[in-house]
């Protein structure tokens, strides 16, 4: 708890207001105690956490099968969380080519139920340094291409998909 508070306080002291707090690779879901701290601090600061609504058993089962220890206690904590919650959370799927990655992304988005979904991605410029720090460099370069691709923009428009951010989500929550 001390570390999480220290990080948020440092950012606020530097003159920034975080739009949300993130679990980074789901680490705060690693134990009920971590999650309790994560959600408590989010509510105290009024900064939304990327918390997932687990009231839909299909969603909870998906994350259990993905290795997250979603005990009844965790589901109950999420139910009591008062700030906005995600209906689903995913990352841009990999592909063996740019076109395949784009098809996989379209398939993922098409499979989603209406609601608030966070899809993480790591857009990157191809550099020698990037190639030395991650084996997923090609996926990241394609992700940068993906979100400037006119076909992706058209797909979003044709399917009524609204791109938003945590500040807008929080504003809608307050209204």
Language model region names:
Residues 14, 100-133:
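Catalytic grooves of carbohydrate-active enzymes
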Residues 1-5:
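Glycine-rich anion/phosphate-binding loops
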Residues 49-50, 133-175:
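C-terminal domain-boundary segment and adjacent tail
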Residues 21, 119, 156:
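Conserved, mostly hydrophobic/aromatic
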Residues 24-26, 54-57, 88-93, 122-126, ...:
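Active-site beta-loop-alpha junctions enriched in small/polar residues
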Residues 91-97, 107-108, 139-142:
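Short, glycine/charged-rich beta-strand-loop motifs at protein surfaces that mediate ligand recognition
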Residues 7-84, 96-103, 110:
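Catalytic domains of cell-wall/extracellular-matrix polysaccharide-remodeling enzymes
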């Amino acid at each position: 708890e001390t570390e999480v508070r220290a990080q948020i306080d440092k950012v606020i002291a530097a003159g920034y207001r975080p739009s949300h707090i993130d679990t980074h690779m789901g680490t705060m879901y690693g134990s009920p105690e971590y999650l309790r701290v994560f959600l408590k601090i989010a509510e105290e600061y009024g900064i939304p956490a990327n918390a997932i609504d687990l009231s839909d058993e299909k969603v909870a089962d998906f994350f259990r099968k993905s290795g997250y220890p979603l005990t009844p206690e965790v589901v109950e904590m999420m139910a009591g969380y008062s700030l906005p919650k995600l209906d689903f959370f995913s990352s841009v799927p990999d592909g063996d080519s740019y076109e395949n990655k784009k098809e996989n992304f379209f398939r993922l988005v098409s499979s989603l139920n209406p609601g608030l979904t966070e899809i993480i991605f790591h857009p990157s410029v191809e550099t020698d340094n990037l190639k030395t720090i991650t084996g997923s460099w090609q996926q990241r370069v394609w992700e940068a291409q993906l979100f400037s691709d006119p076909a992706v923009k058209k797909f979003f428009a044709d399917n009524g998909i609204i791109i938003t951010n945590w500040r807008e989500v929080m504003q809608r929550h307050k209204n």
